[in-house]
């Protein structure tokens, strides 16, 4: 009976399965980080274990009573999402469907990243997991922020504001990086988990993106000039 109930829940979660997966991964990450902090708490370890025991005694009966509620609620919400999705697919314009599909892709990618983060935490410990997260953060910031800024920078008001704001942002980002590096070298190991702002990489990526856009504009301009010249020659030929 329990197996049938479990299978029916798994089949029912057609839209929100990623929520359950993400929750499991988050709980696993928090558990690993808590265990790491407890093992490295030094003289406070015994006090932490006493508090942990007291909390477990109080929370366990409550958990046993309500443990099935979140899953039942998730199944109910999943059914509602299914109804809304059907109506949306039936009546929504193509552009809206495209946006929703892109959101689904992002959610899928985020779930994959969460799985990789938990895997790193389990195999290499919290530091390896944070290093992985910092690498992914750096890649995301460099690629996506540069593309967005390159598009926005085409508008004159934003371009003028950016010329003033970017040097200030670069200055404070460098100050932040120096502070994190100095504190890490002084022995504050937890500070070493903080990601650095990849200022140089962002600048290089922006220059590359800007050059690519300018090259694309020049190519379009040359094509326009060629077309105009061809039209002019054709007009001259017709007049003769």
Curated annotation (Swiss-Prot):
UniProt name for this protein: REF/SRPP-like protein At1g67360
Extract the InterPro entries matched here.
REF
Q: Which PANTHER family match?
A: REF/SRPP-LIKE PROTEIN OS05G0151300/LOC_OS05G05940, REF_SRPP-LIKE PROTEIN
The Gene Ontology biological process terms listed for this entry are:
cellular response to hypoxia; developmental vegetative growth; lipid droplet organization; pollen development; positive regulation of growth; positive regulation of response to water deprivation
Species, as recorded: Arabidopsis thaliana
Q: Extract the ranges annotated as region (Disordered).
A: 208-240
What Pfam families has UniProt attached to this entry?
A: REF (PF05755)
- The residue ranges crossing the membrane are none
Q: Name one GO cellular component term.
A: endoplasmic reticulum
Where would one find coiled-coil regions in this protein? none
Into which family does the record put it? Belongs to the REF/SRPP family.
């Amino acid at each position: 009976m329990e197996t049938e109930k479990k299978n029916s829940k798994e089949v029912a979660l057609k839209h929100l399965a990623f929520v359950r997966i993400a929750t499991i991964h988050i709980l696993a990450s928090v558990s690993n980080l808590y265990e790491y902090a407890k093992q490295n708490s030094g003289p406070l370890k015994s006090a932490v274990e006493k508090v942990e025991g007291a909390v477990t005694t109080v929370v366990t009966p409550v958990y046993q009573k309500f443990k099935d509620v979140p899953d039942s609620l998730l199944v109910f919400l999943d059914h509602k999402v299914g109804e809304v999705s059907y109506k949306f697919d039936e009546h929504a314009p193509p552009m809206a469907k495209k946006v929703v599909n892109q959101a689904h892709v992002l959610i899928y990618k985020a779930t994959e990243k969460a799985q990789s983060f938990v895997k790193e935490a389990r195999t290499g410990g919290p530091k390896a997991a944070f290093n992985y997260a910092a690498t992914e953060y750096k890649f995301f910031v460099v690629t996506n922020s540069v593309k967005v800024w390159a598009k926005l920078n085409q508008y004159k008001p934003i371009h003028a504001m950016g010329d003033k704001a970017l040097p200030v942002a670069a200055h404070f980002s460098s100050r932040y990086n120096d502070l994190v590096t100095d504190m890490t070298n002084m022995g504050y190991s937890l500070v070493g988990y903080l990601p650095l702002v990849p200022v140089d990489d962002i600048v290089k990526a922006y220059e590359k993106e800007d050059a690519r856009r300018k090259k694309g504009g020049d190519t379009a301009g040359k094509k326009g000039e060629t077309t105009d010249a061809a039209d002019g020659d054709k007009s001259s030929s017709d007049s003769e």
